[in-house]
């Protein structure tokens, strides 16, 4: 079985140094092939122009997209990429990075966070992905984090940061219509920036812990907007120093 990791244009834009650490880990540990994006020729120049200077050259040197062979598994850190592949490439197996680590790296060094309590924020974009949800919780357990569940967790979540407070990109509607059209009734309702912030502040009142853990960069975008202390799970797994 061959594995190929999609580094994600948006994740790398939002978490440039972290993205490089993950890419280096996968290349050095598994010799894994890395590409940027889940869609051929999608906003190539636009994302090159907004990448942080520290990652720009490596990003440009990374292939934008390579067609997948049937025996190749796509490793994903982005719920958008996952949805696109699940619908546009149903013959290609898709595995979250979190599941891959658990299944293939018995020697992974898990940082110890001292039994700190953190709320887990699930994501609507993969509300029905039980395997990923379980993997995230197991990784948190292995990092000695006490997980606090929300009432609207797992398949009940309707949260994806502020991304659901603006129209869905046309590309998503075309490449993943089940997720972003059929399953999205009542989602992607346009709100002003002021309304988005108010909705996010109201959502964050549900959290029972100081810190929140999410595993979607669209979710963390919303948390960041209102100053909610949070981590992307990748930040916990791949810190600057362990």
Description of each model-found segment:
Residues 1-242:
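Iron-sulfur cluster-binding electron-transfer modules in prokaryotic oxidoreductases
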């Amino acid at each position: 079985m061959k594995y190929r990791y999609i580094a994600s244009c948006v994740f790398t834009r939002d978490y440039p140094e972290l993205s490089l650490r993950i890419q280096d880990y996968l290349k050095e540990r598994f010799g894994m092939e890395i590409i940027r994006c889940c869609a051929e020729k999608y906003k190539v120049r636009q994302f090159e122009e907004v990448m942080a200077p520290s990652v720009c050259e490596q990003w440009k040197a990374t292939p934008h997209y390579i067609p997948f062979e049937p025996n190749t598994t796509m490793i994903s850190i982005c719920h958008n990429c996952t949805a696109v592949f699940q619908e546009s490439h149903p013959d290609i197996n898709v595995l979250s990075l979190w599941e891959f680590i658990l299944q293939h790296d018995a020697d992974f060094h898990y940082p110890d966070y001292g039994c700190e309590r953190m709320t887990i924020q699930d994501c609507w974009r993969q509300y029905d992905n039980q395997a990923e949800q379980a993997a995230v919780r197991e990784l948190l357990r292995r990092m000695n984090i006490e997980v606090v569940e929300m009432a609207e967790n797992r398949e009940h979540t309707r949260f994806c940061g502020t991304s659901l407070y603006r129209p869905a990109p046309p590309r998503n509607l075309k490449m993943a219509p089940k997720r972003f059209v059929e399953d999205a009734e009542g989602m992607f309702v346009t709100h002003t920036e002021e309304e988005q912030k108010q909705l996010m502040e109201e959502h964050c009142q549900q959290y029972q812990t100081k810190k929140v853990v999410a595993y979607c960069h669209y979710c963390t975008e919303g948390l960041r907007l209102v100053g909610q202390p949070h981590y992307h799970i990748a930040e916990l797994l791949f810190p600057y120093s362990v």
